[in-house]
Amino acid sequence: MSARAFRKFAPLFDRVLVQRFEAETKSKGGIMLPEKAKGKVLEATVVAHGPGVKNEKGEVVPVCVTVGDKVFLPEYGGTKVVLEDTEYFLFRESDILAKFEK
């Protein structure tokens, strides 16, 4: 995705924009998988995030993920966003289940 598209789209508050990994098209044995057998991809890469949310004291608490982090998502949820013919999903930070350590 080009940087120009991200300048036009900036998540607010604790929202995180992710791009899901591509579903496997072959099994480990090399058999081509039909579309229905692929399953839902629950892993994604963070491509943008908002600044965070304010706490009771009015201080902004930053999000705990950064651009490039690999995260684990719930099976359902998120808002689908299409930017420059590429599909992304927008989640609240609290909806993200886990972050893979580097």
Curated annotation (Swiss-Prot):
Origin: domain of life: Eukaryota
Keyword S-adenosyl-L-methionine: no
GO cellular component, one term: mitochondrial matrix
Major location (coarse): mitochondrion
One Pfam match: Cpn10
UniProt keyword terms in alphabetical order: Chaperone, Mitochondrion
Compartment(s) where it occurs, according to its Swiss-Prot or TrEMBL record: Mitochondrion matrix
Single Gene Ontology MF annotation: protein folding chaperone
SMART domains, per database record: Cpn10
GO biological process annotation, one example: chaperone cofactor-dependent protein refolding
Coiled coil: none
Annotated CDD domains: cpn10
Family stated for the protein in its record: Belongs to the GroES chaperonin family.
Function: Eukaryotic CPN10 homolog which is essential for mitochondrial protein biogenesis, together with CPN60. Binds to CPN60 in the presence of Mg-ATP and suppresses the ATPase activity of the latter.
Subunit record text: Homohexamer.
HAMAP family, per database record: CH10
Record-given protein name: 10 kDa heat shock protein, mitochondrial
Species of the source: Schistosoma japonicum
